[in-house]
Amino acid sequence: MNEEQRVRQERFKLLMEQLLIPEDVTANHLKDGKIEKLTIKKDERRWHFQLSIPTVLPASIYELLADRLVQTFSHIAKVSFQIQYGQPDLSEQVWQSYWPLIVAKLTNISQPLKEMLEKQTPRFDGKRLVIQVGNETEAIALKRKLTEPLQQAVQSFGFPAVQLDAEVKESKQAFEKFVEQRKQEDHSKVVEAILEKKKLEQQVEKKMKEEKLTIGYPIKDEPVPLETIVEEERRITVQGYIFAAETKELRSGRTLLTFKITDYTDSILVKMFSRDKEDIPLLQAVKKGMWVKVRGGVQNDTFVRDLVMIANDVNEVSGKETKDEAPDDEKRVELHLHTAMSQMDGISSAGAYVTQASKWGHKAIAITDHGVVQAFPEAYGASQKHGIKVIYGVEANLVDDGVPIAYNEAHIPLLDSEFVVFDVETTGLSAVYNKIIELAAVKVKNGEIIDRFERFADPHEPLTNTIIELTGITDDMLKGQPEVEQVLNEFHAFIGDAVLVAHNASFDMGFLNTGFQKMGLGEAKNPVIDTLELGRFLYPTLKNHRLNTLCKKFDIELVSHHRAIYDAEATGHLLWRMVKDATERDILYHDQLNDNMGEGNFHRQRPSHCILLAQTQEGLKNLYKLVSMAHVEYFYRTPRIPRSQLQKHREGILVGSGCDKGEVFEGMMQKTPQEVEEIAKFYDYIEVQPLANYEHLIEKELVKSREALQEIVANIVKLGEQLGKPVVATGNAHYLKEEDYIYRKILIASQGGANPLNKQTLPQVHFRTTSEMLEAFAFLGEEKAKEIVVTNTNHIADQIEEIHPIPDKLYTPKIEGADEEIRQMSYNRARKIYGDPLPEIVEARLEKELKSIIGHGFAVIYLISHKLVKKSLDDGYLVGSRGSVGSSFVATMTEITEVNPLPPHYVCPNCHHSHFFNDGSVGSGYDLPDENCPKCGTPYVKDGQDIPFETFLGFKGDKVPDIDLNFSGEYQPRAHNYTKELFGESYVYRAGTIGTVAEKTAYGYVKGYQSDHDLHFRGAEIDRLVTGCTGVKRTTGQHPGGIIVVPDYMDIHDFCPIQFPADDRGAEWKTTHFDFHSIHDNLLKLDILGHDDPTVIRMLQDLSGIDPKTIPTDDPEVMKIFSGPDVLGVTEEQILCKTGTLGIPEFGTRFVRQMLEETKPSTFSELVQISGLSHGTDVWLNNANELIYNGTCELKDVIGCRDDIMVYLIYKGLEPSLAFKIMEFVRKGKGLQPEWIEEMKKHDVPDWYIGSCLKIKYMFPKAHAAAYVLMAVRIAYFKVHYPILYYASYFTVRADDFDLDTMVKGSAAIRAKIEEINGKGLDASPKEKSLLTVLELALEMVERGFSFQKVDLYRSEATEFLVEGNTLIPPFNALTGVGTNAAINIVKARDEREFLSKEDLQQRSKITKTVLENLDAHGCLEGLPESNQLSLF
């Protein structure tokens, strides 16, 4: 090899490294490659590589090389390349592997020809590529059209020119046979490929259980931290946790794995391409939750605009896992913990905590969220799974509803008393640890200040900046001042027997009494008045009762607030006003003041935190009652529990003293030992936490130092010993792992100044191990630390019973005789329709269903649903069913649903003769041809949708029925309120929901945090932070139609607490505190949903006088609109739509209209298929659509709804239980087991059907589809036969956005507006997209010969379009900027009398100037003068 060739080879090797081509690929396929030439066109930004490689590359390696070349240099230039092979060995196998790539290069041929070629597998006989065709004409056409483009495509891969030939099959019949055979082979191959894939996946899974996953070579390199990757790298190794992973099949057939990895210093996106078929299951085995080591290069990805790692090797490794290594009998129990249900504060789920505690070997764990118990159901589920005790609790906001106004009560007249109004300024809040620096007072008699006292005291220590800013007192002002003892002595003499008065007296008296006691004077015995509490009683409507707020109310001057003398003087003047107001309420004596304490003042008290743990099942119910009271009766900013209510419902509850916001900790900081002792007596156990949790108190200068904190904690421990109460060490955990800290920080930051935690450094509050907690309390000594961390926490846990937070069975309301009533109702209606005796098929179905329904206690659910539907029907509104209720024939016979699930059949309404088609030959009874009864000649009624009962209540008939009903949107509130009549107001609640932080919202929080802290996160790191913040509780709400019914022999608190949705005390309904899914199997949930269809039907009935139940379901003219618009008297070009289904529910969207264009349905059953196909996932696209397009089967044969599978397989001869199991697996996207496939094949189930089952991810119930289609067909009937009525109902009920100015101008203007919006594409606003649908209907309407008038001041309605001949008069609220309330007010004012002027219109209808201008601009105020004034000449 000469020097030039060696250089070319070295350059090629370097290029492969730059492209991050795996080493094994280079060694096996690209070893002797060279760069022969590189052509660069700078002005066009184009590079062209000419490469030489000795042997032909496998197609997959060619693709890899092409992908990497284009991707790597895409940010610099547009890259192309040509390969020259030394000795191209072009076997038939090579041609066939490259054939999809060759066809993909044929861009200038027709689509049908291209699709025909894609299905070919050409033969190669050494010189010719042979393609099979149907006849000689096709052969000539193929050679003429394809020879030249094919040669160009072939040569672009570096292959020599090849001759193209077409081989004609012997006959058309033989060709068709060949095509059919090829189809069958293709379907078999699909099934085999899927099974082979599953087999490989199972092998990989099995291998991974035995050993860790390795893709590529083992990695021995040391990983670098992700935060150090700031630029492109040729080769680097990283290690971390995968938090997102997905595999995607590329068009080329190769698989791309992308995953996001973090080491908690940063995150990065990793890509890896499969090299061969064996790689694919390995790539698919890479999952979220794995720890991996990755080796590869880092490059700038222009698509994601970020640094991305291209992996060559991936090795699974052991993750870093925290363990609790304390001996089993010496492990702690966490008694204070917050889950993601602590609103915008807790991060980790209850399940994650319980799982971790179980892994660590803890015997129990408590759940104590802020004010709520919404994590209980999840915690309970996890406890059952892991066999660990969960202690159910809450961190409550405790308020004193009995805070005294007066202390040391005395029977002395207020108006005649002498008062000393005083104020102290101090070095801090603690009467124990801080000192008085100023004491000032005024003596008040008969409203006059008769004496003053003002002294500074030298604390002999520097003041903090906070105190200097707050009080204006400086160190210099205090130097040389008297000792505090001297000041207190003088003050003691000054007060004499006067009544002492202070604002927030407990604070000032605390310092005074502490000082007096130290000097041996004893506590002051004087009567005391607290003006703060007196203000709360006298003036409850004030927003707060701070001194400055109260002074402002009475115009009392307050200068230098927070200086003792000025505060005392202002309080003195204030006191006298308050005393006079009190006497007006007949409060004349000091000892009468406390008669009024606590009256409605729960919301004025500052809450203190405490922990409530349910000790017994009775205690849990009491806890639920307290949580309900806190949310319903005592909610003010937060849910609050008055101390008196806690005392009443304390049975079975352990009360703990809580965190630093609890009374005991605050008392130990601020009050005398005697006061703290009194406070602590209220609690069952005392709580202390790691010093880190309290360090913000040092930050805020409320505590001097860490040593002072240690002293407070030690004093609390001693206090517990004195009182004989257990002291426990708790972690106050808000998340699972230390690294989760950032998520909480972002969530707290998102709340801005509204959250006081933003004013402090957040402590590290992860779920701590035993050793971490012991270390945190080491300053107490090893023995004491172990006692509070291990011994006492276990002691508390042992006192608590195993509790069930939700019952373990269904409790339905009891209605006397419900079982018999449902049985009789079902049989009576069945006999009325089918005669007596009933046909065997009818009776068998009824008995089968009634046995399950009555046997499992579900009859009452049917009866309630019947009553609700009957009430709506009696009130004139149809009810549509949804979900699977239409699978129940009993539901049909009790008139809960109109869908009849029996096999398609004829039944005579006169003599009841019937004929059933139970062989699968008919899809829907509505599709049967019209026939007369052979017995009596009466026209048959046609019915039956062939739906198995099992899809509703399960194969054993024991699944709790979920009866969803679509009521008219305008009737829905009446239906809801009817449940109160049926069951009583205290037994019905709206189903509660919990709104969590959504991904989009979390993204905003992360971006905001990044901006506020001047940070730059990689895209993958943003995704990690978003994931960490997603799912945290943000608010609560209510299900749009769900009503929970509590039986009258139970109490809601046997199941859960209650609250108002979003804590809105003005809401009409209370909701369940738990998310309704949590109690779905325990209480009856009625789904009383609001829907437009019944409202439209009611309006059409009112306008036409036609009973919707009499509308035929097989009207041939109506069926035509599903395949074209001709029946409407318009063309596709006129209405810009290829079907007539614009505005028809379920069939008007672009997606479904496209399906209709491709399938041309003409029967009811095919419409049901379309409905099922459009709602499923992977049922239509890449599945049924291909089968129909390829001619494999027709629309009626494909799998559309879940029930089709069971029915079809039973008709094929499979056991019903297996058919049901297969249906359940397929509908949930779980595919098929190999043994089921064998069984299906035994019963001649075709391969295409099996292949279809394997692709499906989710399926729609047929009963739901049938109910929807029934409503759609009725509405379509009016569109065809009563068009102007249809358009009036559509625009009134369904449309929200209008452009009336355009609509009144006719079709040209409407078409231009449609084209304008369509021209914007993705840039069109949501409002414009909504308007587009309305404009499409408006265009169709005017093209059919109808028109719109302008809004008319005297003829328009408020909210309904009016029909006048062939034109519609729009309502006021259809005008832009005119809301419904304004529209109603205009009509109301108009009905009173005519408008004299625009001024009169605005004044009497109370509309805004903007609304008036909109009416005027539209032209409906023509001729109306501006004002009421008349000019006289």
Curated annotation (Swiss-Prot):
It catalyses: DNA(n) + a 2'-deoxyribonucleoside 5'-triphosphate = DNA(n+1) + diphosphate. Its EC number is 2.7.7.7. The keyword Lipid biosynthesis does not apply. It comes from the Bacteria. It is found in: Cytoplasm. SMART domains: EXOIII (SM00479), POLIIIAc (SM00481). Residues 419-575 form the Exonuclease domain. Keywords: Cytoplasm, DNA replication, DNA-directed DNA polymerase, Exonuclease, Hydrolase, Nuclease, Nucleotidyltransferase, Transferase. One of its GO terms (molecular function) is DNA binding. InterPro entries: DNA_pol3_alpha_NTPase_dom, DNA_pol3_finger, DNA_PolC-like_N_II, DNA_PolC-type_N_I, DnaE2/DnaE/PolC, DNAPol_HHH, DnaQ, Exonuclease_RNaseT/DNA_pol3. Its main location: cytoplasm. GO terms for cellular component: cytoplasm. Coiled coil: none annotated. Belongs to the DNA polymerase type-C family. PolC subfamily. NCBIfam families: dnaq (TIGR00573), polC_Gram_pos (TIGR01405), PRK00448.1 (NF001688). Required for replicative DNA synthesis. This DNA polymerase also exhibits 3' to 5' exonuclease activity. This is DNA polymerase III PolC-type.
